[in-house]
């Protein structure tokens, strides 16, 4: 997923499992996350882990196949440096030890985003190298300083550090004209802990509403060629409505597998109560006819700096 959807997952998949070590990689998928959201959610994931666990954290920056090897390293590396989080840049490591042409061996066919087995092996080798370097340079046990428990002020804001994820198990709609509980689940997430589900409907124009509290409000949803698009918006405390935001649940390119997306509905600097509306699109092309739309949950950011 991208780092916004990771905010919704981090409690179940990392914090509640009391893991010893985690590698954070969103340099690839955050390319398709809205610019005003990327750094805030990436920093939010890091702060959630560092403030709620003793988990050791390393960052990984993966890139696309073709030059200039796109990825979000240029945005994420400064955040890691700010928090003294060690990182591995696949692109930098390959170009330092080999050549640009090496990346042609790390992807199959016309694939440009997902590395093949050799590509994953290359990434793993650089992670191992970084860990061995850190281990080699460790001081004697008695000279290892106590870990710092107080984080510095946030670079962006603290909203996503204190985000709450609403789903079918912890919130009920205040109105509903045709949505039912239940959404797709990722097999890997099932293996690692709880999988939160939301709501879906194939009824054209069906609307579901919720009352939530937060500074920034967004919705998460599942993408594939088996869905129909939806619309989402909020009613502000003064009774006015925000603009309607399209939820692109239908993605022709995702055939046989799911994508996981986040769309922000409102961004604020203080916690307020909002009414969230989601509506199954009334108009859709034939390719979406009869298919359901969905939301897997609502992500409500909390405090800000």
Annotate each predicted stretch with a short phrase.
Residues 1-2:
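Short beta->alpha junction loops
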Residues 5-140, 192, 198-206, 211-214, ...:
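Alpha-helical cap/lid subdomain in secreted, periplasmic
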Residues 121-195:
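Catalytic cores of secreted or luminal carbohydrate-active enzymes
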């Amino acid at each position: 997923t991208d780092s916004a959807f990771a905010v919704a997952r981090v409690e179940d998949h990392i914090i509640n499992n009391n893991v010893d070590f985690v590698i954070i990689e969103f340099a690839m998928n955050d390319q398709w996350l809205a610019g005003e959201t990327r750094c805030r959610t990436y920093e939010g994931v890091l702060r959630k882990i560092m403030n709620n666990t003793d988990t050791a954290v390393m960052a990984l920056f993966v890139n696309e196949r073709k030059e200039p090897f796109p990825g979000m390293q240029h945005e994420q590396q400064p955040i890691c440096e700010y928090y003294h989080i060690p990182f591995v840049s696949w692109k930098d490591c390959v170009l330092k030890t080999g050549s640009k042409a090496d990346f042609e061996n790390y992807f199959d066919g016309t694939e440009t985003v997902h590395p093949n087995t050799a590509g994953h092996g290359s990434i793993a080798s650089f992670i191992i190298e970084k860990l061995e370097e850190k281990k080699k340079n460790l001081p004697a046990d008695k000279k290892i300083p106590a870990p710092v428990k107080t984080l510095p002020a946030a670079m962006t804001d603290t909203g996503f550090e204190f985000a709450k994820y609403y789903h079918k198990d912890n919130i009920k709609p205040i109105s509903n004209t045709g949505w039912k509980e239940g959404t797709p689940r990722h097999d890997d997430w099932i293996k690692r802990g709880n999988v939160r589900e939301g709501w879906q409907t194939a009824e054209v124009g069906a609307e579901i509403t919720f009352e939530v509290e937060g500074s920034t409000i967004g919705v998460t949803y599942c993408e594939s060629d088996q869905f129909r698009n939806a619309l989402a918006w909020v009613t502000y405390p003064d009774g006015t409505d925000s603009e309607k935001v399209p939820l692109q649940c239908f993605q022709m390119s995702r055939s046989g597998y799911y994508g996981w997306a986040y769309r922000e509905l409102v961004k604020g600097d203080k916690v307020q109560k909002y009414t969230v509306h989601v509506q199954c699109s009334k108009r859709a092309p034939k390719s979406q006819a009869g298919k359901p739309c969905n939301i897997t949950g609502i992500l409500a950011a909390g405090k800000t700096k």
